[in-house]
Amino acid sequence: MNIRATRVGEQMKKELSDIIGRKLKDPRIGFVTVTDVRVTGDLQQAKVYISVFGDDEQRENTLKALEKAKGFIRSEIGQRIRLRKTPEILFEIDETIEYGSRIERLIRQISDEDGRDSEEVNDEPKNG
């Protein structure tokens, strides 16, 4: 990704957060965070990564609502960011936050188990 595509992606991320949070009134859209926007070098496509607070059904409903509102979102982006052609928007669920949380839970679980194992070793009577 070139510098211009990166800058356009960052600007789109800010604008998309505002549009999704304030302009869209669809009740299917839950608590959404735009985590990243990757724009192709020719500025024709923008892959928008979102994180949705909720279960799998909530994520699916939010994704459907965003797909339905894609035309409105794209026209809003076109009005806010001056480009020759507004990039086509593709929404994807960002799994990295959930993956990170899962790894953190596993590490905490292992740490707790190690703590209990060391307590059991310390509780054994000492021969002295």
UniProtKB/Swiss-Prot annotation:
Keyword Metal-binding among record annotations: no
Entry keyword annotation includes Cell wall biogenesis/degradation: no
Main location: cytoplasm
Organism domain of life: Bacteria
Matching InterPro entries: KH_dom-like_a/b, RbfA, RbfA_dom_sf, Ribosome-bd_factorA_CS
GO terms, biological process: maturation of SSU-rRNA
Cellular compartment(s): Cytoplasm
Keywords, comma-separated and alphabetical: Cytoplasm, Ribosome biogenesis
Molecular-function GO terms, alphabetical: ribosomal small subunit binding
GO cellular component: cytosol
Family: Belongs to the RbfA family.
Main function: One of several proteins that assist in the late maturation steps of the functional core of the 30S ribosomal subunit. Associates with free 30S ribosomal subunits (but not with 30S subunits that are part of 70S ribosomes or polysomes). Required for efficient processing of 16S rRNA. May interact with the 5'-terminal helix region of 16S rRNA.
Known partners and oligomeric status: Monomer. Binds 30S ribosomal subunits, but not 50S ribosomal subunits or 70S ribosomes.
Name under which the protein is recorded: Ribosome-binding factor A
Annotated source species: Geobacillus thermodenitrificans (strain NG80-2)
